[in-house]
């Protein structure tokens, strides 16, 4: 464990950020899985509405630096292509 006050604070702040980032990343992945499940079931209307929610979560994660912007764009593009293929 760190002895210096600033190092102790960094440990605490990093832990809080890690937990927050983990929650947001998990929520994003869950939304993506819901879209993919709807696509597998050939449920176009549901997939489109779920895609909007997933897109929002992906953009939020990219905006907060949890994932890279290019990775976010790639994920949204691949989901959109799957939906358009229905």
Swiss-Prot record:
Keywords recorded for this protein, A-Z: Ribonucleoprotein, Ribosomal protein, RNA-binding, rRNA-binding
Annotated GO CC locations: cytosol; small ribosomal subunit
A GO BP entry: translation
GO molecular function terms noted in the UniProt entry: small ribosomal subunit rRNA binding; structural constituent of ribosome
Family: Belongs to the bacterial ribosomal protein bS20 family.
Annotated HAMAP family: Ribosomal_bS20 (MF_00500)
Physiological role: Binds directly to 16S ribosomal RNA.
Protein name, as recorded: Small ribosomal subunit protein bS20
Organism: Oceanobacillus iheyensis (strain DSM 14371 / CIP 107618 / JCM 11309 / KCTC 3954 / HTE831)
């Amino acid at each position: 464990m760190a002895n210096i006050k600033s190092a102790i604070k960094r440990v605490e702040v990093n832990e809080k950020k890690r937990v927050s980032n983990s929650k947001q990343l998990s929520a994003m992945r869950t939304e993506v899985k819901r879209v993919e499940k709807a696509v597998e079931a050939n449920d176009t209307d549901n997939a489109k509405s779920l895609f909007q929610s997933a897109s929002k979560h992906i953009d939020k994660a990219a905006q907060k630096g949890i994932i890279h912007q290019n990775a976010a764009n790639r994920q949204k593009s691949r989901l959109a292509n799957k939906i358009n293929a229905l």
